From Swiss-Prot:
NCBIfam families: aroD. Involved in the third step of the chorismate pathway, which leads to the biosynthesis of aromatic amino acids. Catalyzes the cis-dehydration of 3-dehydroquinate (DHQ) and introduces the first double bond of the aromatic ring to yield 3-dehydroshikimate. Pfam families: DHquinase_I (PF01487). This is 3-dehydroquinate dehydratase.
């Protein structure tokens, strides 16, 4: 699994003050730009992209509809994405597919999309349909994060991931069953076919996230050779 860690500055000075040494063991940086006022995102961008030069960066605008901190119309949402992409060409762009489906046609030329779906209330009954619809579009990554209400919800998310990965071996998935109940899914990526796991450093960006240090210890244990 590749490890993703968020940076969530609320203003330019916070972006400038980020200690990049904390991110040495992280594979990808997710810039959660939704913690900024919409008019400040482009102004803060140089601090992020210059500070993390050499690291792969995910540009994410997580809107309130999917558990984020910014309210945007779909057109505002896609316009900010386009502006950031035109200037900085981030390695990945997170696109909230079902929330902003009306402007998805404007994203068809983007080769680096993470099509994402977040549900902080439940694991919906139509989860398999969500997997299917996004997988058919063949983005760089299909990301699904849902909240379990039962152990079966956790198993369903993991089983769907394994099934879709088996049928679509070239497609990358990043799937999460959130909260304490779903934490197992964050550690099982290599088994179920989820390529990325999201961790926290200074601040948690999703329910059930573990710290980078804890994740490193867990991965070390999972990879131990225990043969006699």
């Amino acid at each position: 699994m590749r490890i993703v860690a968020p940076v969530m500055p609320r203003h330019f000075d916070e972006a400038q003050a980020i200690d990049i040494s904390k991110y040495e063991d992280v594979n990808l940086i997710e810039w959660r730009a939704d913690f900024l006022p919409k008019d400040e995102i482009v102004a803060v961008a140089p601090a992020i992209f210059e500070k993390f030069a050499g690291k792969e960066i995910i540009f994410t605008l997580r809107t309130v509809q999917e558990g984020g901190n910014i309210t945007l119309s779909s057109q505002e949402y896609v316009d900010i994405i386009k502006e950031i992409n035109a200037i900085y060409n981030p390695d990945y762009i997170d696109f909230e597919y079902f929330t902003h489906k009306s402007v998805f046609q404007e994203m068809l030329d983007f080769p680096n999309l993470i099509l994402s779906y977040h549900n902080f209330e439940e694991t919906p009954e139509n989860l398999m349909e969500a997997f299917s619809e996004m997988t058919k579009l063949a983005p760089r990554v299909v990301k699904i994060a849902v909240m379990p209400q039962s152990e079966q919800d956790v198993l369903d998310l993991m089983n769907y991931t394994r099934g879709f990965k088996t049928l679509n071996p070239e497609q990358e998935f990043a799937t999460i069953s959130m909260g304490k109940l779903g934490r197992l899914s964050r550690f099982a990526g290599d088994v179920i076919g989820s390529s990325w796991t999201y961790v926290s450093l200074d601040h948690v960006s999703g329910p059930g996230q573990v710290t980078l240090n804890d994740m490193k210890r867990i991965i070390e244990v999972l990879e131990m050779d225990i043969s006699n």
